[in-house]
């Protein structure tokens, strides 16, 4: 099962202050949504989401595909439009249909939606697992932090962004002399779900803060609630609205008769390995359209004459040299 690895994302100096450019969050947002559906995250409506878990996992785990999809989604949201279909020799270009018109409406709307959310952010924080999942699920209602620097600027009504994916409203901020005192004053299950004793709770915070700093600055209990609008919900709607055909368009795949809806190309390494291998005779008609501008047509010949293959350095096109 695919999982969202927060450790793979550089941890920003916490808390960051001010609005966040949404373009800097697309990768984390896309990775989070794909990993949630690939792993069937509890609470997600997998019935309403049109992409299969295996499809999401393949996008997530193929570095080249993921990077291409991230860059294309970012560009589309900034420009408010989808690129045209890739040109395929011998296949006439299709006229714009209702699906394409729907994409044209979806992208500028959702791009503006994301921008509004990220512009409204006042403080950006990062949390490790399992605390991020607990905050998203609403079981962790209080975030404990050292009362230093910009943390002291957080007040009731502030909008916080966690891990570039989750927005939380600040309901209240209370200051304590120590984490032990905070865990006594707050309901421990709201601060550290799954931890039953104050002693164990203090041990959790000791992994992040020394006792000396705790005594010097004191600590803050930041009570939070989850607003309805969330960046990950918007990204979820973008992927659902594009579906297999729209995402295929972003990845440079041409839609032809007989195209498998959830088909994705193999990794470049697997493709080159196959092309460089021995070609068996009596091969039927197969058309494979791939990203990275690779299109291979195997002709319906019962006996292929001997040939060699090579890779064009600039275009990445596979060349067939007949002997």
Each language-model region and where it sits:
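Mixed-charge, low-complexity intrinsically disordered regions
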Residues: 1-167, 171-322
């Amino acid at each position: 099962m695919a999982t969202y690895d927060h450790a793979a994302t550089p941890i920003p100096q916490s808390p960051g202050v001010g609005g966040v450019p949404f373009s800097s969050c697309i990768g984390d947002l896309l990775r989070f949504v794909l990993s949630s559906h690939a792993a069937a995250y509890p609470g997600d409506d997998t019935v309403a989401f049109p992409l299969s878990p295996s499809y999401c996992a393949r996008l997530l785990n193929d570095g080249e595909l993921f990077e291409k999809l991230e860059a294309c989604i970012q560009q589309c949201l900034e420009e408010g439009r989808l690129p045209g279909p890739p040109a395929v020799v011998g296949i006439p270009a299709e006229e714009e249909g209702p699906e394409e018109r729907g994409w044209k409406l979806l992208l500028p709307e959702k791009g503006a939606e994301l921008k509004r959310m990220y512009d409204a952010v006042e403080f950006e924080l990062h949390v490790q697992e399992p605390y991020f999942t607990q905050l998203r699920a609403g079981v962790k209602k209080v975030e404990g932090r050292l009362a230093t620097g910009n943390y002291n600027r957080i007040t009731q009504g502030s909008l916080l962004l966690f891990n570039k994916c989750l927005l939380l409203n600040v309901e209240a901020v209370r200051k304590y002399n120590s984490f032990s005192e905070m865990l006594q004053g707050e309901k421990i299950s709201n601060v550290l779900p799954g931890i039953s004793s104050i002693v164990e709770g203090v041990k959790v915070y000791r992994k992040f803060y020394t006792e000396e700093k705790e005594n010097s600055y004191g600590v803050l209990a930041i009570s939070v609630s989850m607003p309805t609008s969330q960046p990950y919900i918007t990204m979820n709607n973008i992927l659902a609205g594009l579906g297999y055909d729209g995402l295929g368009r972003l990845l440079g795949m041409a839609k032809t008769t007989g195209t498998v809806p959830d088909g994705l190309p193999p990794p470049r390494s697997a493709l080159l390995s196959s092309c460089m291998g021995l070609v068996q005779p009596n091969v039927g008609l197969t058309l494979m359209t791939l990203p990275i501008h690779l299109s291979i047509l195997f002709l319906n010949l019962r006996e292929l004459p001997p040939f060699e293959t090579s890779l064009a350095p600039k275009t990445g096109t596979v060349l067939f040299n007949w002997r």
